[in-house]
Amino acid sequence: MAKLEILHFPDPRLRKRAVPVDKVDDEIRRLVDDMFETMYDAPGIGLAATQVNVQRQVIVIDVSENNDQPLVFINPEILDRVGEEEMQEGCLSVPGYFETVRRADRVRVRALDRNGEPFELETDGLLAVCIQHEMDHLDGKLFVDYLSPLKRNRIQKKLEKLTRQGALPKNIDRQHAI
């Protein structure tokens, strides 16, 4: 396994749309393993392949306290959204920033697992929010896109400055670093 480099906002590569995975093979499973290692090390609770500059529809998530419930979603598709909830979100690609975002409270999603087997999952709360957040990445969308242009621009300028200084913050609030 290998740790991958996480792209940071406003890197334009984060705006690229991911393409579906044609076949779940050893290369995809290796990517999944590397993504988990990268996510756990960051630390975070979710990571999309586009965040590590791989334009494939692959996300990994683990919202458990002990990093012992890893979930893999390949070619995920949301089938149903119910309700509305506001939750504080952060992002490994927008380190050090946490903002309130409104999303569906409950989702039903269909995807392939790490072996290419199809499955459906209906969930709510943090896992539902995390799935929606990561799926946004696959479409080139970031949680800062839900903020006002003024706030988004302020975050962008600050991160650009910190990047130039080599002083990007590390996400320390794992429960919100999606």
Curated annotation (Swiss-Prot):
What cofactor is this protein dependent on? Fe(2+)
Which species is the source of this protein?
A: Thioalkalivibrio sulfidiphilus (strain HL-EbGR7)
Question: What does it catalyze?
Answer: N-terminal N-formyl-L-methionyl-[peptide] + H2O = N-terminal L-methionyl-[peptide] + formate
Q: Which UniProt keywords apply?
A: Hydrolase, Iron, Metal-binding, Protein biosynthesis
Disulphide bonds in the chain: none
Binding locations of Fe cation: 91, 133, 137
Question: What's the protein called, per UniProt?
Answer: Peptide deformylase
Q: Which NCBIfam families match?
A: pept_deformyl, PRK00150.1-3
Matching HAMAP family:
Pep_deformylase (MF_00163)
Active site located where?
134
Q: How is the cofactor bound?
A: Binds 1 Fe(2+) ion.
InterPro entries per the record?
Answer: Peptide_deformylase, Peptide_deformylase_sf
The enzyme's E.C. designation = 3.5.1.88
Q: What does this protein do?
A: Removes the formyl group from the N-terminal Met of newly synthesized proteins. Requires at least a dipeptide for an efficient rate of reaction. N-terminal L-methionine is a prerequisite for activity but the enzyme has broad specificity at other positions.
Show the GO MF annotations: metal ion binding; peptide deformylase activity
* Gene Ontology biological process terms from the UniProt entry: co-translational protein modification; translation
Which Pfam families does the protein's record reference?
Pep_deformylase (PF01327)
Q: Which residues form the signal peptide?
A: none
Q: Which family does it belong to?
A: Belongs to the polypeptide deformylase family.
